[in-house]
Amino acid sequence: MADQKIQIRLKAFDCRLIDRSAGEIVETAKRTGAHVRGPIPLPTKIERCTILVSPHADKDARDQYETCTYKRVLYIVDPNDKTVDALMRLELAAGVDVQIKLT
């Protein structure tokens, strides 16, 4: 696996959960002897939704809700077979979306 990189993108609604998962990935990769760059925080996507509270005429009565999507990216440089096996066996939290790309 010479001259290869593994890109791991993490996405979650809870920033503590994504940071804990990124830490587990970094620890696992370093334990197997690979070099890790990251976790690099990507811009947070904030979606806001405004809902009218009053069912009739009160336009001033509104509630606002927002959801924040946090993202991190990790690069594992020069991975070996142990690194790939350890990452495949790694159990992450249920609220974290993981995308893995081999370049």
Swiss-Prot record:
InterPro entries assigned to the protein according to its UniProt record, in alphabetical order: Ribosomal_uS10 (IPR001848), Ribosomal_uS10_CS (IPR018268), Ribosomal_uS10_dom (IPR027486), Ribosomal_uS10_dom_sf (IPR036838)
Keywords annotated in UniProt: Ribonucleoprotein, Ribosomal protein
GO biological process, one term: translation
Cystine pairs: none
GO MF, one annotated term: structural constituent of ribosome
GO cellular component: a single term: ribosome
Highest taxon, organism lineage: Bacteria
Family named by the database record: Belongs to the universal ribosomal protein uS10 family.
Role of this protein: Involved in the binding of tRNA to the ribosomes.
Record-linked HAMAP family: Ribosomal_uS10 (MF_00508)
Subunit structure: Part of the 30S ribosomal subunit.
Name assigned to this protein: Small ribosomal subunit protein uS10
